[in-house]
């Protein structure tokens, strides 16, 4: 069998039929799999010495979330270096990146593999990979025929990336206009909620507006901030991060605005604050809702007038900083409760974004699981880490109250458990490797901590009672001090001070 003119014309037509790049890519690889009668096909994008799957057919869904580094995958490195069609023999010693990732064939290894590097001019922009369980599957197709397929795919991918680059304003007035791949931000997800979020990020990134990023703990608000910064004209300048929840009130002002020598005990030299560090760049204020009202007023002044004062200094400094703020609180409710300034809220929320919880992202769970599996594989030096069908189903059926962060920890824990029970450097994750159901959480103690303390005096009893309340709040909030302070209805700085006095922290 070989390609006829009709077959090639059919592939070209399929590339024009799709609505949007993703649909065209999917049509391309689905058609190729049918024409070549192979078990799996994939279109990959090349970026920063790694291949990123754009569309797959015949492979496990979590492949779309994986990032295949050249260092970790010698076959893909060979494809990247070759510059032409690469055929791997069935007895090749090089491991196939898709071993264990063909549904129903998790325990079997791929036999036949062909790689087609894709170029835009002299630049490598991606690859097509074709895999089959039958060793001689691709022998009937000549290299010339496969080069024609690669040329069609390269044209489609090159056009798509160039359009994406223009839409994201990565080619700005005065730039050379030379094609450059867009940087990966690890915002993995194809669900409608994530697709909408990515569109909103593209819209606001090129502006200089302040952005308020809302969402539950663990959803990836910091990644959103990085994506906004990378897509902005300020990307060549620093993105400075500050977690407001981890700031004791006594040093918060100094952290934000800096201080001069002698401003307070311990100020032995002048020190720049985060605003100065972020000058001409971006400042990301995580957990903005934890700032005291006094600091909120000073932050508002910076946003209004663009000048700061170091602690202990009468002079003002001009700064040009874009502020991105994140919170897991409902700041509208905080404003109504008097805990957050209404004027600051309106200054920050010029363009609000909401990061959806993982439970609302559908099959994105599997894509993210694939990404974390690949990270674990590289970190632990394993040849492969794959999810069984049962494990994928198990992950999809769980509610993920801790969102993406909980999924990451669950995958890492499962890999360690599976590795301990299986010899060799190959890990297949099964449902039993994940302890996700609520019934596996430790049961609360039979005796309530509200029981009457058996101490000799009122002060000792009160302190023991306070210690137990703080311990319980920390345990119930994953040792997050800000969340624990909210649960106890106290200020986080006061909670830190009380914990120190009670001997609960250094």
Swiss-Prot record:
Protein name, as recorded = Anaerobic nitric oxide reductase transcription regulator NorR
4-aspartylphosphate is carried by which residues?
A: 57
Report domain Sigma-54 factor interaction positions. Answer: 187-416
**Record flagged with keyword Secreted:** no
- Tell me if Ribosomal protein is a UniProt keyword of this record: no
Q: In which pathway does it act?
A: Nitrogen metabolism; nitric oxide reduction
The protein's superkingdom reads Bacteria
Q: Which residues bind ATP?
A: 215-222, 278-287
Gene of this entry: norR
Q: Which residues bind DNA?
A: 481-500
Its annotated function is as follows: Required for the expression of anaerobic nitric oxide (NO) reductase, acts as a transcriptional activator for at least the norVW operon. Activation also requires sigma-54.
MF GO annotations: ATP binding; ATP hydrolysis activity; DNA binding; DNA-binding transcription factor activity
- GO BP: any one term: phosphorelay signal transduction system
Print the keywords alphabetically.
ATP-binding, DNA-binding, Nucleotide-binding, Phosphoprotein, Transcription, Transcription regulation
Q: Note the PROSITE patterns from the entry.
A: SIGMA54_INTERACT_1, SIGMA54_INTERACT_2, SIGMA54_INTERACT_3, SIGMA54_INTERACT_4
Recorded hits in NCBIfam families, A to Z, give: PRK05022.1
């Amino acid at each position: 069998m070989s390609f006829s003119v009709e077959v090639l014309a059919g592939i070209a037509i399929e590339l024009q039929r799709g609505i949007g790049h993703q649909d065209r890519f999917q049509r391309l690889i689905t058609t190729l799999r049918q024409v070549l009668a192979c078990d799996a096909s994939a279109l990959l994008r090349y970026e920063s010495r790694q291949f990123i799957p754009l569309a797959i057919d015949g492979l496990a869904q979590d492949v779309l979330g994986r990032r295949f580094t050249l260092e970790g995958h010698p076959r893909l490195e060979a494809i990247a270096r070759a510059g032409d069609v690469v055929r791997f023999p069935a007895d090749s010693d090089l491991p196939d990146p898709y071993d264990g990732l063909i549904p129903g064939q998790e325990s079997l290894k791929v036999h036949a593999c062909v790689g087609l590097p894709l170029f835009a001019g002299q630049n490598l922009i991606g690859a097509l990979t074709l895999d089959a369980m039958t060793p001689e599957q691709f022998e009937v197709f000549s290299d010339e025929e496969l080069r024609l397929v690669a040329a069609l795919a390269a044209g489609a991918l090159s056009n798509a990336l160039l359009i994406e680059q223009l839409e994201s304003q990565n080619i700005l007035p005065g730039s050379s206009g030379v094609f450059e791949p867009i940087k990966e931000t690890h915002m993995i997800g194809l669900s409608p909620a994530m697709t909408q979020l990515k569109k909103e990020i593209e819209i606001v990134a090129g502006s200089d507006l302040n952005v308020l990023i809302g969402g539950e703990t663990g959803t990836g608000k910091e990644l959103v901030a990085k994506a906004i910064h990378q897509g902005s004209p300020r990307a060549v300048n620093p993105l400075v991060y500050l977690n407001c929840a981890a700031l004791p009130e006594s040093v918060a002002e100094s952290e934000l605005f800096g201080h001069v020598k002698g401003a307070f005990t311990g100020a032995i030299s002048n020190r720049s604050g985060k605003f100065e560090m972020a000058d001409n760049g971006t400042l990301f204020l995580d957990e903005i809702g934890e700032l005291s009202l006094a600091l909120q007023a000073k932050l508002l002044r910076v946003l209004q007038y663009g000048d700061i004062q170091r602690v202990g200094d009468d002079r003002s400094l001009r700064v040009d900083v874009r502020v991105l703020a994140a919170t897991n609180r409902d700041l509208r409710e905080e404003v109504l409760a008097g805990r957050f300034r209404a004027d600051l809220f309106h200054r920050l929320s010029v363009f609000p974004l909401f990061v959806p919880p993982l439970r609302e992202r559908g099959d994105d769970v599997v894509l993210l699981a694939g990404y974390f599996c690949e990270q674990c594989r590289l970190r632990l030096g394993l040849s492969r880490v794959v999810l069984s069908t049962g494990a994928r189903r198990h992950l999809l059926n769980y509610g993920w109250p801790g969102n993406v962060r909980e999924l990451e920890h669950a995958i890492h824990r499962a890999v360690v458990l599976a590795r301990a029970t299986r010899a060799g450097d190959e890990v297949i994750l099964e449902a039993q490797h994940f302890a996700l159901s609520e019934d596996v959480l430790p049961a609360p103690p039979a005796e309530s901590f509200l029981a009457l303390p058996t101490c000799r005096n009122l002060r000792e009893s009160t302190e023991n009672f306070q210690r137990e309340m703080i311990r319980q709040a920390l345990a119930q909030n994953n040792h997050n001090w800000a969340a624990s302070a909210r649960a106890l209805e106290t200020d986080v700085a006061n909670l830190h001070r009380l914990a120190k006095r009670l001997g609960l922290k250094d």
